[in-house]
Amino acid sequence: MLLRLYNTKTKSLSEVKNFSDIKVYACGPTVYNYAHIGNFRTYIFEDLLIKSLRLLKYNVNYAMNITDIGHLTGEFDEGEDKVVKAARERGLTVYEISRFFTEAFFCDCEKLNIVRPDKVLIASEYIASMIEVIKVLEQNGFTYFVNGNVYFDTSLFKSYGQMAGINLNDFEFSSVSRVEVDPSKKNKSDFVLWFTNSKFKDQEMKWDSPWGFGYPSWHLECAAMNLDCFRSTLDIHLGGVDHIGVHHINEIAIAECYLNRMWCDIFVHGEFLIMEDEKMSKSNNNFITIQDLETNGFSPLDFRYFCLTAHYRTQLKFTFNNLRACKVARKNMLNKLTAVFSSLNQFDLLLLSKNYENIESVLEKRYYDSFLEKIAFDLSIPQALALLWDIIKDDNLSALSKLRLTFKFDEVLSLGLKEGVFREIEKDRINIDDAMNSLLEERRLAKIRKDFKRADEIREYFYSKGFVLIDTEEGTKVKRG
């Protein structure tokens, strides 16, 4: 089954046709602070895409960058390096800051069940590749050097800004109008490829280059690391909608002028998580971290469930009330699945351990195919989540089928359902001592001779000790009350 995704370049759905080697790149974090839940909404959407591709039998090569240099506080080459600024404020070196927040990022990803990329590209480790890209662009006539910086001349790249619908004649710095336009530029839309000592003298991370001792721009980093990692073209590029109007159109300009051909087929962008009608932003001091959620009594997977309730191309409004509702929903789902699991016999438990494809069931397969159709249609995850609830509630499905489908779907949804069910089962497991076993046997015999008073007395005794007796066809089960 082919995956279709909304392609920002074409403003339409594009089919992902190459099953054998899909090259996917995602813009990763700038490691100067903790990633916030607005960032993680994007990373969760990207995680859902990677896992959907794999469930649909695509062979995926997935890379993500870590920006530890060159990402300025202004998007248009203005301001100072975010990592340097954070290091100065905390009294640490830039290397200490970037290492600490890189580890913190992947720790949070693990809590959210976000898969680690096949390749993690650290920007400061690819300086040679970045210099090589500038050299080729320079040879091809796309750069100019002024006031100590190497600029990309956007007027020479005829399709510059097309993905964002930008007309160079009308180009304005609307998102940062408070910033004075650099008078060194030939065109307003030109951007820096390499900064030297002429700017930001406190920059700690610098390297020698043919243009002077300096450091690369954020836009160059992503393009150069892509080209180094995948050696040529890219199938899918991922990021947030805030990347469309500056970062990604600059990446396209660099890569296509370097390759002298089209670089990336499909660009996919996730929408904002908003708070009080504004996007969540570290620069606006308007953000919540995963640690903040945990402090307030939420599991990171409650937040993941929350993100699954909205399509990745729609804005999602965050409130703690909404998150609380998702916490309750996920808990209810786990409780229902735990009850289903408790009803399995030993033969079902054995079958549950087998691969999904080995068991035939018409209704089960219908649900499975429906799930694939939903994720294959532009990641219709809210509909896939609703389908999971339908499965849990469907009395025509056996307990075995419900669990097999749920655990298979959770390979994409990643709500920790299998692990959660096993934890609940383990919590309910009771170590019965000899005295309790004797009482259970006494109660069994009392019921046979219809001494229900004694049977109820024993039930009440267990209840007073924090246990509940559940009578089934297979005998009496003991659970914690």
Swiss-Prot record:
Binding, Zn(2+): 27, 222, 247, 251
Keyword Repeat appears in the UniProt entry: no
Biological processes per GO annotation: cysteinyl-tRNA aminoacylation
EC number(s) from the headed UniProt entry: 6.1.1.16
GO cellular component, one term: cytosol
GO function term, MF aspect, one: cysteine-tRNA ligase activity
Enzymatic class: ligase
Free-text remark on how the cofactor is bound: Binds 1 zinc ion per subunit.
Binding site for ATP: 282
Keyword field: Aminoacyl-tRNA synthetase, ATP-binding, Cytoplasm, Ligase, Metal-binding, Nucleotide-binding, Protein biosynthesis, Zinc
Catalytic reactions of this protein: tRNA(Cys) + L-cysteine + ATP = L-cysteinyl-tRNA(Cys) + AMP + diphosphate
Subcellular location(s) of the protein: Cytoplasm
Record motif 'KMSKS' region, residues: 279-283
Principal location class: cytoplasm
Motif 'HIGH' region boundaries: 29-39
Pfam families referenced in this protein's UniProt entry, alphabetically: tRNA-synt_1e
InterPro entries registered for this protein in UniProt: Cys-tRNA-ligase (IPR015803), Cys-tRNA/MSH_ligase (IPR024909), Rossmann-like_a/b/a_fold (IPR014729), tRNA-synt_1_cat_dom (IPR032678), tRNAsynth_Ia_anticodon-bd (IPR009080)
Cofactor(s) the record lists: Zn(2+)
Gene3D superfamilies according to UniProt: Cysteine-tRNA ligase, C-terminal anti-codon recognition domain (1.20.120.1910), HUPs (3.40.50.620)
Subunit relationships: Monomer.
Family per record: Belongs to the class-I aminoacyl-tRNA synthetase family.
Alphabetical list of PANTHER family matching this protein: CYSTEINE--TRNA LIGASE, CYTOPLASMIC, CYSTEINYL-TRNA SYNTHETASE
Protein name: Cysteine--tRNA ligase
Provenance organism: Borrelia turicatae (strain 91E135)
GN (gene name): cysS
